[in-house]
């Protein structure tokens, strides 16, 4: 490009040829705007030909000749102001429009931006598309739509735009060489004031639900023709629902809200008219992301007792399943869950349904299991998105991103139904009639009255599953109302110390005392700052945790016990009672503990092979004496040390000292010997030691003598009124239901022959009767057990959970 100077004034450049390159066009625009400094706006960037110093500036024309002094002064002042370090910095836009992105120029947050308005491109100004990251490669385009925060109404920005538009119209900004063509174009396009009015109209409370609809309509209406050919920018890819559903409403008439203008036309209403019938449920808040209806969360239908837990569960499911929102696969059904396949929708949910239809995704049924009208015909489970229901508006795309469109796998069965696992074939066969076993849409009130509810499909849950007899619902609120005072752990430790001193020898007592003494400083450090309220809260935490464990213990078939940190039994499963013979009432201290089986120990510490007498706290007299020292209204549960033999007790407390304040997630897996529950009636005739003397504790007995009848000085022992020397065998049925046959023959061999119960072998264990025979000879059941310590909020050991499996 050349220019000449005649008579002190620059002559206009010759006309450019019709085929100009983009660089020449940009240079020409830059030269034109350099002659009109008033055209520059603070929100628009200079052309690159000026900013990089290679174009026109500092009074030089394109060919390097000097310009007149007046023009040189204006250009120099303008260029100096642009390099002023104190000039206000332009705010970086969150996302540039398509035109500014192609030109690599700074854009603004408003739409249309100032640069597109000055160039007459306001009708095609829209957000540019960024290159997808690798982790978003499989995400649909609608999930990548920028948030509505950038498109919200900004009153201050709109006022500035209006002032700028008025000043531009007064000053006449279109003074370039293409003035005529621009004026011709402007006749067919709205003015800047009209654009500002259309794009930044005040969003009243009546159109809060149409945010994404307006954004999508602007993108589809003002998209250039060249972009329409691009598959990645095709607005048809944005026809699916945005991440947040625009149909939420908590008003009394939610059916008037529409999904899009096309649906509104089908239903005979318009977005503005339908929205104006309902007030804004949020008041002054235009967009409340914490509201549950934003993500189609129906709090009432979720199986939660509180709002915050349901919201947290819903958001976790929303994050887990809402990113890709791909059609459901067979893996969802193999897990026993319908998954997103249950989220079938029709047009009735978006504006033209009856008043009985619920606007939420999950419907009005609080159990989350009824999803289809009961009278509906055969349904194809693969056609879950209703591709022809909304005439192309929702083709192959579900409604919003919901929490797996009904967490069927987390729904707990009620007390009137039995848990059943759904097979895969029920979902894979399109000809199967779903109405015979479940429903996919919330049925209307009329359908509820006409037809009974079909059985619901659900995955077995351990929380509220029906075990044995019908269970009544328990509320944890009773725990917080009933606990009024802290638990006296001091009395528990005193009782434990007294029991250990009575049962164990001094040497074994010292080993247990050393283990407990090692954790005593930690107990003191963690409890010295606790007051009365903290101790009450600690007991509430214990009872609340125990409330959860009781349900799992009842549903689990493993022998399990739960005890406090003092070793007092707090919960027990029926399998443990079957294995050991200890009744639940006895373990919890509700019935007297009459056990005499201590694994061979005695009060004096002498082995059971000696001729010592048994004097245990477990006798009826001793139990009454111990209970007299307990606080009023408190019973004394059985200690864990009473259930194990001597070596197992010592090993347990040594491991407990390491785990109590050590690894909070640690566990111990080892072997032990559980003591069977034996009273005097059971034990005297069942056990004798190797010397032929009666041993109530059972002691360490030989194989040949372990099952023989009790022998004192050569005479048989009478049981239940059976006289000595009787020729008939005496049969004793103890409190546990065990039948003990006491033969007249004193030999162990004849005893084995005459007692069918004692003839059980390990290969013939079957049912409860077989479990009762474990440890029948010596009163000990060899087990492998695993236990762990659970701490409370003060990091103090709260309870011990133990699982046992017998070694057979």
From Swiss-Prot:
Key word Metal-binding present: yes
Sequence intervals crossing the membrane: none
GO biological process: one example: cellular response to starvation
Molecular function terms from GO: DNA-binding transcription factor activity, RNA polymerase II-specific; RNA polymerase II transcription regulatory region sequence-specific DNA binding; zinc ion binding
Compositional bias ranges of the Polar residues kind: 158-170, 189-203, 248-279, 339-359, 377-387, 620-629
Keywords noted in UniProt: Activator, DNA-binding, Gluconeogenesis, Metal-binding, Nucleus, Transcription, Transcription regulation, Zinc
GO cellular component: nucleus
DNA-binding positions: 97-125
Pfam name, any one: PAS_13
Biased composition (Low complexity): 69-83, 171-188, 442-451, 598-619
Region (Disordered): 1-90, 158-203, 236-285, 322-387, 442-461, 598-629
SUPFAM superfamilies from the UniProt entry: Zn2/Cys6 DNA-binding domain
Localization annotation: Nucleus
Role description: Transcription factor which regulates nonfermentable carbon utilization. Activator of gluconeogenetic genes.
Family: Belongs to the ERT1/acuK family.
Name this polypeptide is given: Transcription activator of gluconeogenesis PAAG_01030
